[in-house]
């Protein structure tokens, strides 16, 4: 009989992803009602989304879930203050190290899951990152590292103080207005920074006035700057330098009531939510129940937080052609075995297909890592499959369950791919948290390599950054940001979605279990695969239970992805190695026995005569005996490690 193709498995995963996203809306509302979201529902199209079987045409949806503008702001977290990084106990406040105040330790840093934040070892693991909402209605991650460098001079170096580098007022920080680079921050000079070096703010940089240049030409710039800084009382400020208030020219730090900010953050609610309507999302609603099929006209349903719903007719008039069985043109992918274990084993052993699907999803890994991923997936997936089988009221056959397992495996790989992006974002945050100890070293080397320092510069006069430095530094950080996110140096804007934070709302096991029902529905609705073969999945024997432990063991064994040829080659190499090792070490036992005898004689002589010489002989003979005892197994395992 025919089986699902790679195209069918991918389509099943897409269907399950969209339907799970629909149910995820209610879960998000229950867990994080104060983080507002937008979503769009439309009838799925076989041309644009996934193949829609005729039996699902009235239920198949394409769902997009995103943060609203207010929700994006609520998720944002900047984790740096003037002299370090925030912790779970750091209250919300502002820095005033330049003319612009910068908020830090927002509630999203540690209050998305407060219980998790208070666990031992989680003090430095922020739960979100810093985001901005673009004119294109996207919530994107920004480059907080450059913002930290501009706003917190103390974090620029590991060793304090380096005159003119970390004992200075900060740059003014503002988001880049260029819509092509919403992730970027720009640094700007200010009067307080220029005053630190005896200059004035002129045309966006620190310079002498024309008459000061004449005086400097006569006296020398260093002498003139020294007298000017002395007159402005800057040296006394440097003796008691305050990193939180680095200059009297700067405005006072804004006052902040952290408890009030936290309470306001938690109190946000979306008053436009239609709770009764959204309850349907967990009940597999039809297009008619959602109001998306008005007299045969398909509608797109868009929800905007704090505004409500809007309906627009969708652009396409048809939802894709229905597949027609073409047995004569179908590839030979048939399988006659109705045993569930055989179906699972056969699918896993066809590693070219499975590995190809993983590559299409976006995984770039060695076969060894892929095997490990398969084993981890199967350990959790098969128990969930049994729970689904017990919980469903649908008639399930052996072949239907086997094909659902295949789709679930592909769907699990898709979920891991999504979580990889989330992990990248969290990795950036973790790197930022360690900036004062790790990135700081890189930054100081970068700074020292790009600045021309005087041989003797006790006040850091020559460490003043040139006019172009903030823009150059910002571009450098932005390049590193893109390269960290994507090894292919992609410059596409990455939108961060609520599902990237799914681990706060639901566990992986729950998500996998719920998705199995959608996968079962999709596979059961398929009548013809992408090759044009009739599936007839309901014609095999019904299955009501299976041995979970046996199936897990079978899956783990099949996940090894060994062929018979590989096994025979392994056996041949192993036998050859054992024979070589035995021939090369025939005398090891005899020599070890002789040394053990000498060890016993030396020990007896030492006990009888109490002379140090006999003890030395005893120690030498004992070490030699031990060497010859372990020599053979050591050489064997060393060779095995090299070969295998």
Curated annotation (Swiss-Prot):
Example of a GO cellular component annotation carried by this entry: viral occlusion body
Domain of life where this protein originates: Viruses
Record has Ribonucleoprotein as a keyword: no
Biological processes per GO annotation: viral life cycle
Entry keywords, A to Z: Viral occlusion body, Virulence
Function, as annotated: Essential for virulence of baculovirus occlusion bodies for insect larvae.
Homology family: Belongs to the baculoviridae p74 family.
Name of the featured protein: Protein p74
Organism: Orgyia pseudotsugata multicapsid polyhedrosis virus (OpMNPV)
């Amino acid at each position: 009989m025919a089986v699902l193709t790679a195209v069918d498995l991918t389509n099943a995963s897409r269907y399950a992803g969209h339907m799970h996203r629909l149910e995820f809306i209610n879960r998000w509302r229950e867990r994080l009602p104060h983080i507002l979201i937008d979503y769009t529902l439309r009838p799925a199209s076989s041309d644009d989304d996934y193949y829609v079987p005729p039996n699902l045409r009235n239920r198949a949806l394409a769902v997009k879930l995103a943060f609203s503008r207010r929700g994006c702001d609520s998720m944002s977290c900047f984790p740096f203050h003037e002299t370090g990084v925030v912790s779970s106990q750091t209250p919300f406040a502002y820095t005033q190290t330049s003319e612009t105040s910068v908020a830090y330790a927002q509630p999203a840093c540690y209050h998305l899951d407060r219980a998790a934040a208070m666990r031992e070892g989680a003090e430095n693991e922020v739960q979100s990152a810093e985001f901005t909402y673009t004119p294109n209605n996207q919530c994107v991650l920004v480059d907080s590292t450059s913002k930290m460098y501009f706003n917190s001079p103390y974090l620029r170096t590991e060793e304090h103080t380096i005159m003119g580098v970390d004992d200075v007022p900060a740059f003014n920080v503002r988001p880049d207005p260029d819509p092509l680079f919403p992730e970027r921050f720009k640094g700007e000079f200010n009067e307080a920074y220029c005053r630190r070096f005896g200059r004035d703010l002129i045309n966006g940089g620190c310079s002498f006035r024309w008459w000061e240049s004449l005086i400097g030409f006569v006296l020398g710039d260093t002498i003139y700057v020294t007298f000017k800084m002395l007159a402005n009382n800057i040296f006394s400020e440097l003796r008691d330098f305050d990193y939180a208030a680095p200059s009297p020219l700067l405005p006072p730090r804004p006052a902040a009531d952290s408890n009030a900010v936290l309470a306001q953050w938690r109190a946000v609610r979306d008053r436009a939510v239609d709770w009764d309507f959204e309850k349907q999302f967990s009940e597999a609603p039809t297009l008619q129940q959602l109001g998306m099929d008005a007299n045969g006209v398909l509608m797109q349903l868009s929800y905007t937080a704090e505004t409500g719903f809007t309906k627009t007719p969708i652009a396409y008039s048809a939802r894709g052609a229905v597949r027609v069985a073409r047995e004569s043109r179908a590839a030979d992918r048939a399988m006659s075995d109705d045993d569930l274990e055989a179906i699972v084993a056969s699918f896993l052993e066809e590693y070219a297909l499975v590995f190809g699907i993983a590559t299409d999803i976006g995984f770039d890994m060695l076969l060894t890592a892929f095997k490990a991923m398969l084993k981890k997936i199967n350990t959790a997936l098969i128990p969930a499959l049994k729970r689904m089988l017990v919980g469903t009221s649908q008639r399930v056959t052996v072949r239907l369950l086997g094909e659902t397992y295949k789709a679930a495996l592909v769907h699990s790989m898709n979920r891991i791919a999504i979580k990889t992006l989330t992990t990248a974002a969290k990795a950036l945050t973790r790197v930022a948290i360690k900036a004062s100890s790790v990135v700081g070293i890189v930054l100081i080397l970068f700074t020292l390599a790009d600045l021309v320092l005087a041989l003797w510069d006790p006040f850091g006069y020559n460490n003043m950054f040139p006019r172009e430095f903030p823009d150059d530094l910002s571009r450098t950080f932005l390049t590193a940001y893109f390269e960290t996110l994507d090894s292919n140096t992609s410059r596409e804007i990455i939108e961060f979605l609520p599902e990237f934070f799914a681990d706060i709302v639901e566990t992986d096991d729950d998500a996998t279990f719920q998705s199995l029902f959608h996968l079962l529905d999709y596979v059961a609705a398929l009548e013809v695969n992408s090759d044009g073969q009739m599936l007839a999945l309901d014609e095999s024997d019904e299955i009501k239970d299976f041995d979970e432990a046996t199936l897990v063991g079978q899956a783990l064994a099949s996940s090894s992805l060994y062929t018979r040829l590989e096994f025979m080659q392994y056996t041949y190499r192993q036998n050859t190695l054992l024979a070589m090792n035995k021939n090369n070490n025939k005398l090891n036992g005899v020599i070890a026995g002789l040394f053990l005898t000498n060890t016993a004689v030396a020990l007896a002589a030492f006990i009888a005569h109490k002379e140090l010489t006999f003890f030395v002989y005893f120690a030498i003979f004992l070490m030699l005996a031990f060497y010859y005892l372990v020599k053979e197994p050591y050489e064997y395992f060393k060779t095995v490690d090299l070969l295998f």
